[in-house]
C-alpha cells in the first residue's frame, strides 16, 4: 500500500495524475476540487511568506543566524547592498508580482479549455512539483527587475486597479447570492407553506442583527459631545439600509420583480453593518488630553483598547481571518454557478427546487461517480464529460486576489511605514471599506431599479 501511495503521489507531483490522500480511511476527492485546493495551498504559502516579510524583526534574526546572508545579497544585488529590499512593502510587491504573473500565465494557458483530456488541461491539473518550482522562480526573479522605483510605482497602480476589480466581483456575488436565496426559498412556498415561515424567520434575524449592530456601534463608537464623524457615518449607513428596504418592497419594483423582497435587503443590510463595524475598527486611534494631562483614546470601546494592547494576538488573528476570507472568496467565486450568477443566468423559476443548502447542487447529482466510489481509485475524475468550472476564470480570480493581498498587506496607499502590525488599520483601509460598503448598496439598487429604467430589456434576477 505504501509503495502504491508513493507512486500515486509521484505521479501527482511530476505527472498529470490527480492528488489524493493515502490512508484507506480518508475520503476520496474529486479531481476538480483537489486541483483548486492545490492552487489555494500555493496561494497561502506566498501569503505566509509576505506576512513574514512584513515583520520588522525578521531581517535582524536572519542576519544574526545566517552568516553568509549579507555577503550573498552584495554579490547577487537581489535585495540591495544591505538586503534592505528583502523585507518591507517593496519585498511584498515583488513576491506578489511573481505570484500574479504565475496565475496570469496559467490564465492565458487555459483559455478556451472545455475538455479535461486536452494537453493544457493536464498541465492545469497536474505537474505540481514543477509548478511550485515555477512559482518560486517567478517570485525570486522579481527581485532582479531593473529600475525598481519605476517598477514599484507602476505596479502599485496596477495593484490598486486589480484589487478594485476583485472587490467588485465579491460584491456582485453577494448581491446575486441574496437574489438567488430569496428566489429559491420563494419557489418552495408553492408546494409547502412552511417556507413562508422560514423566509420570515431568517428575514427577522437579519434585520435584528443589522439594527442591533448599528445600535451597539452607536453606543461604543460615539460619545455625547464628540465623535461627530462616527455619528454621521452610522446615520448615513442606517439610512441606506432603510432606503434599500423600502425600494425592495415598493409597488413599482414588485410589479417588475415579484421575487424582490425583504430577505435580500436584510442580507445586504447585515453586510453593510459588518463593513461599517470593520471600517470603524480600522480607523486610527483618536487621542485627546484628559483633565489630568494624560492621552486617552476616544470614539472607541474600552475593551477594544485593551485588545489592541495585545498586538501579537490581534495581528495573527487578523492575518488568519484575512487568509480564510480571501481563500473562501476565491474558491466560491470560481464555481460554475458563481460564473453564471455574475452573468445573471439562473434556472427557470418553475424548475427551482427549494433547499436549505441551495448553494449546492440537488441531491442525486453526480450519481455515476457516487456509484463507483468504492471500486474506483482514490481520486474521482469528475470532469470526464467536460470541465466543471472555467480554468481560465479560476486563475484570473487568483490573479486579482494576488493584487488584493499585496495592497492589503502594505496598507494600500500608506505603504511607507506599513508593517504586519499596522495593515489592519489606517485611513486607506478605512476608506476602502467605506467605498466597498457604498458600492454594495449601489449594486443592489441597480438590480432593483435597472428593470424600471430599461423596461424593454430582459433582466434575469
Swiss-Prot record:
Transmembrane regions: 37-57, 91-111, 126-146, 158-178, 201-221, 232-252, 261-281, 313-333, 393-413, 423-443
Bilayer topology annotation: Multi-pass membrane protein
Positions glycosylated per UniProt: 114, 184
Principal place of residence: membrane
Cytoplasmic topology ranges: 58-90, 147-157, 222-231, 282-312, 414-422
InterPro entries: TDE1/TMS (IPR005016)
Residue intervals on the Extracellular side: 1-36, 112-125, 179-200, 253-260, 334-392, 444-461
GO MF term (any one): phospholipid scramblase activity
Pfam families named among the record's database cross-references: Serinc
Keyword Nucleotide-binding: no
Superkingdom, natural source: Eukaryota
One of the protein's GO biological processes: phospholipid biosynthetic process
Location in or out of the cell: Cell membrane
Reactions performed catalytically: a 1,2-diacyl-sn-glycero-3-phospho-L-serine(in) = a 1,2-diacyl-sn-glycero-3-phospho-L-serine(out); a 1,2-diacyl-sn-glycero-3-phosphocholine(in) = a 1,2-diacyl-sn-glycero-3-phosphocholine(out); a 1,2-diacyl-sn-glycero-3-phosphoethanolamine(in) = a 1,2-diacyl-sn-glycero-3-phosphoethanolamine(out)
One GO CC term on file: plasma membrane
Keywords: Antiviral defense, Cell membrane, Glycoprotein, Immunity, Innate immunity, Lipid biosynthesis, Lipid metabolism, Membrane, Phospholipid biosynthesis, Phospholipid metabolism, Transmembrane, Transmembrane helix
Function text: Restriction factor required to restrict infectivity of gammaretroviruses: acts by inhibiting an early step of viral infection. Impairs the penetration of the viral particle into the cytoplasm. Non-ATP-dependent, non-specific lipid transporter for phosphatidylserine, phosphatidylcholine, and phosphatidylethanolamine. Functions as a scramblase that flips lipids in both directions across the membrane. Phospholipid scrambling results in gammaretroviral surface exposure of phosphatidylserine and loss of membrane asymmetry, which leads to loss of infectivity.
Protein family according to the UniProt entry: Belongs to the TDE1 family.
Name of the protein in its database record: Serine incorporator 5
Organism for this UniProt entry: Mus musculus
